[in-house]
UniProtKB/Swiss-Prot annotation:
This is SPbeta prophage-derived uncharacterized protein YokH. Pfam families: SMI1_KNR4 (PF09346). It comes from Bacillus subtilis (strain 168). The gene is yokH. The lineage of its organism: Bacteria, Bacillati, Bacillota, Bacilli, Bacillales. It comes from the Bacteria. SUPFAM superfamilies: SMI1/KNR4-like.
Length: 185
């Protein structure tokens, strides 16, 4: 498998201004400004191996590549009149994943590792069962602590598409047809 996560990250970084901001063309003609920050910290091989041993799993190769580049990131936080008002995708560092896992009640019955947070109410999850089965489609969205839905993607394809879609929930687009699109607005 070819890893291109570094190309996706570097491509996005090349478009940012000196403050880490970017203007994007969004849905229905809106132009919005977003902030993108990548952690300067990098996970070491030792960090990854310790995490894997503790949680009895092997982190996917594409995800490992990302955290060895940047152990965490915030992508497409909304800037309103220059002020960061949140939103976007937060990719957790290994330490932040450990903090998230302390909320056992939230993840009860879910055999996954939360690697990020998005849409103000969803966790991006690596499904441990899929990893153990060698299934490359291991990413799930855990919505509001209720629904655990497969994305049928790996990390680098998710990240690439998320950036291509300017932070829009591209995985829901198939549900919006010409018949129902306008009823949701």
């Amino acid at each position: 498998m070819t890893n291109f996560v570094h190309k996706t990250v570097n491509g996005l970084k090349s478009l940012l201004d000196e403050k880490g901001a970017i203007q994007l063309f969004c849905s229905e003609g809106d132009i919005m400004e977003f902030l993108v920050t990548f952690s300067p910290d990098k996970a070491t091989l030792n960090d990854i191996q310790s995490f894997e041993a503790k949680h009895q799993l092997s982190l996917p190769e594409d995800y490992q590549k990302f955290i060895t580049l940047h152990n965490g990131a915030k992508i497409f936080e909304i800037l309103s009149d220059g002020e960061n008002i949140g939103g976007g995708l937060q990719l957790f560092s290994l330490e932040e994943i450990e903090e998230e896992l302390k909320y056992e009640d939230l993840f009860e019955g879910i055999n996954g590792i939360p690697i990020g947070y998005l849409l103000e109410e969803c966790h991006l999850m690596i499904d441990k069962d899929k990893i153990n089965q060698g299934d490359p489609n291991y990413l799930y969205i855990f919505e509001s602590g209720l629904e655990y839905n497969p994305l049928n993607l790996n990390f680098e394809i998710f990240l690439d598409r998320y950036i291509l879609a300017n932070g829009e929930p591209f995985w829901d687009w198939r549900y919006y047809t010409a018949e129902n699109y306008y009823r949701t607005r």
